[in-house]
């Protein structure tokens, strides 16, 4: 299960209603994992208000190094340090080693815990695997912005579910051997070796894509193919050629082209402050991609397989 919490949903200048960009993705399976995507000003306070412990954050993925997307890192790291964190914090992003080093120099932290900076490629047209464990993967791909910037894909790993009909077809009966099959991937029944893939169906993992700041681009479409949720830059209602951002119709077109299940628009300009503004944005986007929502601070999206 995946819980996505939007901590900040405005673009470059914050408003009283909207904080700078930050999104928490909580993944619950055999273990609980807390990942933060971007960390704008005020992120730690919104973490507190949301009831999510910043001490549980294991990894932070920065899309790019504009201040509205990373300026919350300095106070967040300081608070973790004051709260006597000991676990390593991993920070990913384009040129992360350089920027994280500068951030740590600025803070005079005297860190009691390790902070690891992980560089993410910011050129090319193919996704790159940047993080992986037994339960999920995180991929990145470069996008179109004024500075090196990337989109991220969180991908739950596919699972095998035992199909009882396939077991019957092999003339087998349910038994304790099935537990060994799940644990080891293979079991011997009546002198016959059974592999788990012989009696299982593949259950595709959940997929969430975060575009970061970008104009509409083919790389996001590629990364988001068939995703359960696409979180996309929707800064403007109307196209603005002078800005390296998407308008809401362009974002909806990306969602349609990628064949995603849901689209959430975020990174809205502060000019859109009324209910009527949000309704106009939703109406415009839904004409192209009906399953569209506009994010607001503390909004939650739950995904289940």
Predicted regions and their residues:
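Active-site metal-binding loops of divalent metal-dependent hydrolases
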Residues: 9-10, 40-42, 65, 96, ...
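A glycine-rich helix N-cap at a beta->alpha junction
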Residues: 107-121
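Cap/insert and terminal regions of metallo-dependent hydrolase folds
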Residues: 181-299
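Metal-dependent catalytic neighborhoods of phosphoester/phosphodiester hydrolases
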Residues: 72-80, 102, 273-283
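Active-site-proximal loop/helix segment associated with metal-binding centers of metalloenzymes
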Residues: 15-17, 131-223, 229-231
């Amino acid at each position: 299960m995946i819980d996505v919490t939007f901590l900040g949903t405005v673009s470059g200048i914050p408003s009283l209603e909207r904080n700078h960009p930050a999104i928490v993705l909580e993944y619950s399976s055999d273990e609980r994992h807390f990942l933060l995507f971007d960390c704008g000003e005020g992120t730690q306070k919104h973490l507190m208000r949301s009831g999510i412990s910043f001490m549980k954050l294991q990894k932070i993925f920065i899309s790019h190094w504009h201040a509205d997307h990373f300026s919350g890192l300095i106070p967040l790291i300081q608070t973790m340090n004051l709260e006597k964190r000991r676990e390593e914090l991993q920070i990913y992003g384009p040129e992360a080693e350089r920027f994280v080093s500068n951030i740590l120099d600025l803070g005079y932290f005297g860190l009691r815990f390790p902070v690891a900076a992980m560089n993410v490629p910011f050129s090319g047209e193919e996704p790159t695997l940047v993080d992986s464990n037994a339960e999920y993967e995180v991929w990145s791909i470069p996008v179109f912005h004024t500075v090196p910037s990337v989109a991220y894909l969180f991908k739950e790993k596919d699972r095998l579910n035992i199909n009882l009909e396939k077991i019957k077809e092999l003339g087998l009966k349910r038994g304790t051997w099935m537990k060994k099959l799940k644990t080891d991937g293979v079991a011997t029944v009546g002198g016959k070796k059974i592999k788990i893939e012989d009696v299982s169906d593949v259950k595709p993992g959940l997929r969430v894509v975060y575009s970061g700041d970008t104009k509409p681009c083919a790389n996001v479409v590629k990364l988001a193919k068939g995703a359960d949720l696409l979180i996309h830059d929707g800064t403007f209602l109307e196209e603005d050629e002078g800005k390296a951002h998407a308008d809401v119709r362009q974002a909806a077109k990306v969602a349609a082209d990628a064949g995603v299940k849901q689209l959430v628009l975020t990174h809205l300009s502060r000019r859109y402050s009324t209910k009527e503004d949000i309704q106009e944005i939703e109406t415009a986007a839904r004409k192209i991609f009906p399953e569209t929502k506009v994010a607001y601070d503390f909004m939650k999206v739950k995904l289940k397989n």
